[in-house]
Curated annotation (Swiss-Prot):
Gene: psidin
InterPro entries, alphabetized: NAA25_NatB_aux_su, TPR-like_helical_dom_sf
Predominant place of localization: other
Residue span of region Disordered: 645-672, 871-902
Alphabetical keyword list: Antimicrobial, Coiled coil, Immunity, Innate immunity, Lysosome, TPR repeat
Organism: Anopheles gambiae
Compositionally biased spans, kind Basic and acidic residues: 656-672
Origin organism lineage: Eukaryota, Metazoa, Ecdysozoa, Arthropoda, Hexapoda
Name this protein carries in UniProt: Phagocyte signaling-impaired protein
């Protein structure tokens, strides 16, 4: 028997290989041959189902899988094949059932139990993990299995269903501690990871004293001799042992004199000692002692480190924030920053360091005075160029500080242009003098000039509401990227600027040069994908969305295997992080939005017949009534730190920050402050809070955008399902989703969201929510839904005629909206500056028309093939059930007493659908004429001449010029083709 199994396994191997390399038809041929010889061979049937699944033939694979599930296989290769099948179909819970049945039949199998453990791990069933781990431990008493169980209990407490119940979570943590205590008492603890897990359990229970004693004890020193010092630091902070912490950090700083994190904790411990009034031996418990220690490090250091100098600034900053008197400070903040500048301005990080402390130079005009002082100290003027690379870096630093201090915000547009010209020339000089012979991966030392100049020029364009300065900025960025091909800052600014101008095709090219991959598709994808849905290039948007979705769907599978490796190696400390990471990725806002937009885009961009579109829809459709978005767990994974911003905070931001400032604590002119505030913001907290406020405000708008688009998608596809399945259940669901759409749209409109300012280039781009609120989406799709629901019910010919007239009126209104947008654009003095707003409105109108065509084409197709009788018996039953099961419809005035005799014949409903489709045809033809008359924006020749006078590469100007023209012409061509495709879609009806 064993020899027979081996023979079959050898014959199955080529089938495995065929599936793995994508030769599914060959695999099916081979497996059919095997099944003719042995029809009951389970592994062959599993492989056959898997091959069918890979070919998209789900209806053929489902019966095979169902039969195998009934048989409950236990053979290893069959289980493996079924596991792969379930993974690909996103049915991970079925793997648990599969191995659970196998374990029941072979109770003593360590291999099957291990596979069952991994299966539960994939779906985060921590309670089942605990049970299986204990079974493994009973079968084979090994520490690894026991601590799998312990970790499973910890995960139940921290991330399980009872994690939000403090009492249950505490009981679970106590259980986990007792399980480890038992091993400690029996002297069974063996490894560092086990000791680390015990420390984690104690910390989660806030038993910091026990954790500290264990960390310092002989057992931990033996098992975990390499315990990182931050564990001790964190525990001392939690225990408020500030004196001991202060002494420890002093020792560490004498060994590592450039550790900025140690300096921050050291200074914080000093202020905590002052607040508590403690004076422990060997600790620094006054600001004078702290300052003296820092000065000693500065004097003793063998070479110049930034750490102790930053620590002096931080000490002074804390004293300013605690309202110490001016004479108590160790210097004026502006003077200390000037000193820091003299020491480290030749390093690119200097301006970023100083930015953390500039807010404490008050009042605001003092910051500009400081910037002027730094600039004057360089000995450079507008007519002189830096004599060395170091002097150039100092000059760049002063320019960045000047911009952040608001120096550019108070000057005229003409002076901004002069600054831009000067920076462009400085960039060119720096590139020629110091940027030659660098590696391809290196950024040029003078690149910062060009980056700053581009941002300044965009600000000028925004002030003037003209595109010429923005085009000059684009030319400079293109010139920069020609010299420094891997300067991602330049690529990001170019991408942002293209989107600001509505140049989608050029933005796509910039996005591709960034080479964003893997997790960056989630954290940085918003920079581009958020703008694509109504950007005029549906095919391009579809390809980008599919690439993004491929990452999410495949990476979720890959990430489900990470905990397996962590359990195998006993790396328990990272398990909670991995669970959180998987949750953030699976519930990513970006993932959900792209999923919804892809479904809508599939309809809008479709270029085939209705049958082809419905075939594509059936492959991707989900039940519209099922909401697969876990709204309470949605996570905003955007990385807003990707842009290095030197723009000054707005007046609104500064006013908001003033509200949070602490009141004077009354230190007056005393030598030492008797009272120190318990909470002091860490350095850079204001910048972080400013970013968080912006992210929160932006996310609120984007969250509502997702609600709006999800509501539209679900309502639209429920109406499609209604006419495909034609059941009263679908009617009730569609009616409910229509009412939900109305409620959501009204709620979002009532919030009156204001767009995010576009004054600065690196600001977040406005949410597309404002586009949809400016167009009649709410009215158009509500009335369309009412019409389609009334069509299905067929109560009254008068009511149906009225609903059809409303839809026809909406079609006309959409055309008028598009016509006004293009006419306003043509009347504007600067076509390119108004291109973005116009092309978004045009694309929004075309999307509305496309969605209407799809839904009404489905209705037409169903009524066209309806029986010729006046009313179907089944239809009469549906009509009686409909009003009882559906929510009230404002457009419905009849009641459940209508019987089959009052139902409008389906042929008459077909006439009304045809009427609206004909109106759509006329409108589409009129819209096509509008698109044909839509003038592309052109770059003036005088601008090209100005670019050449600045000694930039003339190719940059011609490249930008052709990019703008090509973008507009291609967009118009694609949109006209899309409209022709819509005519083809409804060709039967008209």
């Amino acid at each position: 028997m064993q020899q027979e199994d081996l023979a079959y396994e050898r014959k199955l191997r080529p089938i495995w290989e065929s599936i793995e390399i994508g030769n599914y038809k060959k695999a099916l041929q081979d497996v059919e041959k095997m099944l003719k010889k042995k029809p009951t061979l389970q592994c062959a049937r599993a492989l056959k189902a898997w091959a069918y699944q890979r070919l998209g033939r789900t209806e053929d694979s489902a019966p095979l899988i169902a039969a195998l599930e009934e048989e409950q296989p236990i053979e290893a290769t069959t289980l493996h094949a079924l596991t792969l099948y379930y993974k690909e179909t996103q049915r991970l819970d079925k793997i648990c059932t599969l191995f659970s049945n196998a374990v029941r039949q072979v109770p003593g199998s360590e291999e099957l139990l291990s596979q069952l453990f991994i299966a539960y791990m994939r779906i985060d069933d921590f309670k089942a993990l605990q049970s299986v781990a204990l079974q493994l431990y009973k079968l084979r008493p090994r520490n690894s299995y026991y601590f799998w169980a312990v970790m499973s209990v910890v995960l139940q407490a921290l991330r399980g269903p009872d994690a939000h119940n403090a009492q249950k979570a505490q009981l679970l943590l106590v259980l986990a501690q007792r399980m480890v205590d038992k091993f400690i008492a029996e002297n069974k603890l063996e490894g560092a990871q086990e000791a680390q897990l015990y420390l984690q359990i104690l910390q989660e229970q806030h038993k910091y004293s026990e954790a500290y004693d264990f960390l310092q004890g002989a057992l931990c020193q033996k098992l975990y001799p390499g315990a990182p010092v931050y564990l001790r630091i964190d525990l001392l902070k939690q225990l408020n042992k500030w004196g001991e912490l202060n002494r420890l950090l002093k020792e560490l700083l004498l060994q590592e004199q450039d550790r900025w994190d140690y300096y921050q904790d050291y200074i914080n411990s000093t202020f905590e000692l002052i607040r508590a009034g403690e004076k422990p031996d060997g600790a620094d418990y006054t600001v004078e002692m702290c300052h003296e220690f820092l000065c000693d490090i500065i004097e003793a250091q063998p070479k110049k480190f930034r750490g102790p100098y930053l620590a002096r600034l931080e000490l002074n900053r804390r004293m300013v924030e605690q309202r110490y008197a001016a004479e108590q400070l160790f210097g004026k903040m502006s003077d200390m920053l000037a000193e820091y500048f003299e020491l480290f301005a030749d390093k690119p990080c200097c301006a970023l360091d100083m930015k953390l402390f500039l807010e404490f130079v008050k009042p605001a005009h003092e910051r500009r005075t400081l910037a002027t002082k730094l600039m004057n100290g360089l000995g450079l003027s507008s007519a002189t160029l830096p004599a060395s690379k170091e002097q150039m870096q100092r000059h760049i630093c002063t320019l960045q500080i000047a911009r952040y201090s608001g120096a550019h915000a108070i000057v005229s547009e003409e002076l901004l242009h002069a600054i831009y010209t000067s920076l462009s020339l400085h960039y060119e000089h720096g590139y020629n003098a110091y940027g030659q012979g660098l590696l391809v991966t290196d950024m040029g030392p003078s690149d910062a000039y060009a980056l700053l100049a581009a941002q300044i020029m965009y600000e000028r364009a925004y002030r003037m509401q003209r595109s010429e300065p923005a085009i000059e900025a684009l030319c400079l960025l293109n010139h920069l990227l020609g010299n420094s091909v891997n300067n991602f800052h330049g690529k990001l600014l170019a991408l942002q600027l293209y989107h600001r101008l509505g140049l989608t095709q050029a933005a796509q090219s910039a996005y591709e040069t960034l080479d964003i991959k893997h997790i960056q598709l989630d954290s940085l994808g918003y920079l581009h994908c958020a703008q694509l849905a109504n950007a005029g290039f549906p095919a391009l948007a579809k390809a980008t969305y599919e690439q993004t979705l491929y990452f999410f769907l495949n990476d979720i599978d890959a990430n489900s295997e990470f905990p397996k490796a962590l359990y195998n190696f006993g790396t328990f400390s990272k398990l909670v992080e991995i669970v959180d990471f998987r949750s953030r990725l699976a519930n990513s806002y970006h993932f959900m939005l792209v999923t919804v937009e892809t479904l809508l885009l599939m309809v809008v961009s479709s270029g085939g017949t209705l049958s082809q579109l419905l075939a594509a829809y059936r492959q991707t459709r989900r039940k519209p009534a099922e909401d697969r978005i876990r709204w309470d767990k949605l996570h905003d994974n955007r990385d807003l730190t990707i842009f290095v911003s030197w723009d000054p905070p707005s007046d609104e931001e500064e006013q908001e920050e003033k509200k949070d400032k602490p009141m004077d604590n009354g230190t007056g002119g005393e030598k030492e402050a008797p009272v120190v505030a318990a909470v002091t913001k860490p350095v850079g907290a204001t910048l972080e809070e400013r970013r968080e406020r912006l992210q929160k405000r932006s996310y609120e708008q984007d969250y509502d955008l997702l609600r709006l688009r999800t509501g539209l998608s679900k309502m639209l596809f429920s109406l499609v399902e209604l006419h495909l399945s034609r059941t009263s259940v679908e009617c009730s669901a569609a009616q409910q989703l229509r009412d939900d759409w109305v409620t959501v749209a009204a709620d979002i409109r009532s919030k009156q969201h204001a767009p995010i300012s576009g004054r600065y280039l690196v600001n977040l781009l406005p949410s597309r929510l404002h586009l949809y609120l400016s167009l009649p989406y709410e009215r158009v799709f509500t009335q369309l839904a009412d019409f389609v629901l009334d069509l299905w019910k067929g109560y009254s010919i008068e009511q149906l005629t009225l609903a059809a007239d409303k839809c026809s009126g909406d079609v006309t209104a959409i055309h008028e909206t598009m016509k006004r947008a293009i006419e306003t654009y043509h009347q504007s003095a600067d076509l390119l500056w108004h291109w973005k707003m116009t092309h978004e409105l045009v694309n929004g109108c075309i999307e509305m028309i496309s969605l209407m065509v799809f839904l009404l084409a489905v209705c037409y197709d169903k009524y066209l093939h309806a029986p010729t009788s006046q009313a179907q018996p089944s239809a009469g039953k549906k009509v009686k059930k409909g009003p009882e099961n559906s929510a009230p419809n404002t457009a419905t005035t009849t009641n459940a007493s209508n019987d089959a005799s009052s139902v409008v014949p389906e042929r008459e409903r077909l006439v009304l659908v045809t009427k609206v489709l004909r109106e759509l045809k006329q409108t589409i033809n009129a819209m096509d004429l509008l698109l044909a008359s839509w003038k592309p924006p052109l770059v003036e020749d005088s601008l090209s001449a100005a670019i050449e006078r600045m000694s930039l590469n003339p190719k940059c100007a011609s490249t930008v010029q052709s990019t703008i023209a090509e973008n507009a012409l291609t967009e118009v061509r694609d949109l006209r083709k899309l409209l022709k495709d819509k005519l083809k879609l409804m060709s039967k009806a008209i």
